[in-house]
Amino acid sequence: MIRDLQVVRPQTNRTRIKLCLAGPFAVGKTSLIRRFVHGDYDERYIATWGTHVTSKELEVRMGHEQTELPVLVNLWDIMGSKGLRDLRRETYFRGVQGILAVCDATRPETLPVLEGWRQTIFRVVGNVPTYVLANKAEQERAISPEELIMFCEGWGCPFLYTSAKTGESVEEAFAGLTKAVLRYLVP
């Protein structure tokens, strides 16, 4: 009989989290994801249209016992357009549990733009763990550590200089935010 049938789903104890990379165009959001997930870098600039979701499975050490927790991180790469950000905010940002707000360390005008991204996301999901990343750190930096400290003090979040090209601090950024989200979800 049909009523006796059950859908059997694979059981998993893997925690799933949704992280969003946000910021203006051409700051390296897609390249950071590529470096983190695939361990490589592509010199070509390819604009993201709409959104692109990539996943990576991690084993995260948590707690005093350093217990390994299996985590599936879903990384949402959002097109750097303000118009799209505001138009599609409910669709893209619903369920976001952490933000990597990315600016270009060589273009200081990209740092204050992050405030608009943060406000838009927070309107949808509330105050979630956030890291500010000043990407392209392998080049001559036009944003000083002091500027980043002042900017991030208002947000109450850490910042890192990252380089998708060399891999500098990329793993640290994604792993750090993942742990912050897990601590936020399970206080």
Tell what function each PLM region has.
Residues M1-P187:
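TRAFAC-class small GTPase G-domain
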